[in-house]
A protein has these predicted regions:
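Nucleotide phosphate-binding/pyrophosphate-handling subdomain across enzymes
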Residues: 2-8, 18-23, 27, 89, ...
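Conserved beta-strand positions in the Rossmann-like core of class I SAM-dependent methyltransferases
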Residues: 9, 32, 120, 318, ...
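Residue-level signal for inorganic ion chemistry
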Residues: 24, 53, 95, 124, ...
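Adenosine-cofactor binding site in Rossmann-like domains, unifying the SAM/SAH pocket
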Residues: 35-41, 209-213
Length: 391
């Protein structure tokens, strides 16, 4: 039985923080809420009488409230750590990695349901873990931010999909980012890992034989399917159910999602491609000539190698957001023509006006969205709206 302190500080007022505060309040805890931007000397008084700090994923460890709490011996938990303890140690399949987490989690949910299991998909996708209902199994998407402050969270099956540079603006170095990701294995029963990384566990790769071919397109999605297959088998799901899930799962929003086909031109929403590794996979998923919408907020990535890989496939790039200058410099060293569109609406209209039948207008921005949109979902929704309004 989890004993909670009388007073808890929740830092972050977005989705995870709101769910954590609601879960604590429902258990009679006096909840103090703080925006993640707080942290001057006056704000530190929020810690008075607090016995636990719960921080949302967007709150860095350098936040003054977090630093002061740790210095004072106050425990600091991530929202998923709180959710795990409130659910009394549920059976979790945890999924982390740089790219493919949401697709793999939702695919696992489909596979578990095909196998007749009671399953909830939660964490960084679906509902926050503190808002999830009790279930036989929980498939939990875990970001590096969420894994930074776990203490007892234990996965029956822990999956690492891939490891490529990302969130360096938050973690500082790739080593720090990798170390956060690998925390998923600290207390796991079964580890599922990519072949070739040199990690202990059940290995998977894109060329693994599968019970059925996945419905969703792209070589990267076959790799996601291989990871899901290995994880499902480790959880006791038979190949009949796995095959059913692979054949029927339609994919998820904002990941190589066909938004519209108009006069022979396909418009594809891959707004979730918030780093170059994800955008590289998006570009590689198609053989047709591409008109590629790139840009958004910067995350500390070097675009040079990514830009060089675009030349054979991309007919023209349309640059948006604060990353436009960096992307332009990278593209100047290649033969890829580009134009500075500034915003998504201008980019979509320009690409649509120039696109020829058989081409694809692809939003796969290789950047986060926060300079112009609340999140990648809002960016993808705006892309869909713009595309539907084309005539």
């Amino acid at each position: 039985m989890l004993t909670l302190p009388q007073r808890v500080l929740v830092i972050g007022i977005a989705r995870s923080g709101t769910a954590a505060a609601a879960a604590l309040g429902a258990r009679g805890v006096d909840v103090v809420r703080a925006d993640r931007k707080l942290g001057n000397d006056d704000d530190l008084a929020l810690l008075d009488g607090v016995g636990l700090v719960v921080k949302s994923p967007g709150v860095p460890g350098e936040n003054p409230l977090v630093v002061e709490a740790r210095a004072g011996g106050i425990p600091v938990w991530s929202e998923v750590e709180l959710g795990y303890r409130l659910l009394a140690a549920p059976a979790i399949v945890g999924v982390t990695g740089t790219n493919g987490k949401t697709t793999t989690c939702e695919l696992l949910g489909a596979i578990f349901r095909a196998g007749g299991r009671d399953v909830v998909v939660a964490g960084n996708v679906g509902s926050p873990l503190t808002a999830a209902r009790s279930a036989e199994w929980i498939v939990c998407e875990l970001s590096s931010f969420q894994l930074e402050d776990i203490h007892e969270l234990r996965c029956r099956v822990a999956v690492l999909l891939n490891l490529e540079p990302d969130h360096l603006d938050r973690h500082g170095t790739f080593d720090a980012y990798r170390d956060a990701k690998l925390r998923i294995f600290e207390r796991t029963d079964v580890a599922v890992v990519p072949r070739g990384l040199g990690l202990d566990g059940i290995e998977f790769a894109a060329d693994d034989p599968l019970p059925a071919e996945p419905r969703i397109p792209g070589a990267h999605n076959r790799e996601n399917a291989a990871a899901a297959t290995a994880a499902a088998r480790a959880a006791g799901i038979d190949d009949v159910a796995i095959a059913e899930g692979l054949r029927t799962f339609p994919g998820v929003e904002h990941r190589l999602e066909l938004a519209r086909e108009l006069r022979g031109v396909r418009y594809v929403n891959d707004s979730k491609a918030t780093n170059t590794a994800a955008a590289r996979r998006g570009v590689a998923a198609f053989d047709a000539p591409l008109r590629l919408v790139l840009g958004g907020s910067l995350k500390g990535e070097d675009f040079g190698a990514f830009a060089r890989e675009l030349e054979p496939r991309v007919r023209r790039a349309y640059l948006i957001g604060e990353a436009a200058d960096d992307l332009a410099r990278a593209l100047d060293a290649t033969g890829v023509p580009y134009e500075r569109s500034g915003d998504l609406g201008t980019a979509v209209r320009a690409a649509a006006a120039a696109a020829e039948p058989g081409e694809i207008v692809l939003l796969s921005p290789a950047c986060a969205s926060y300079d112009q949109f609340e999140n990648f979902e809002r960016r993808g929704e705006e892309f869909r709206r713009l595309v539907q309004n084309l005539s």
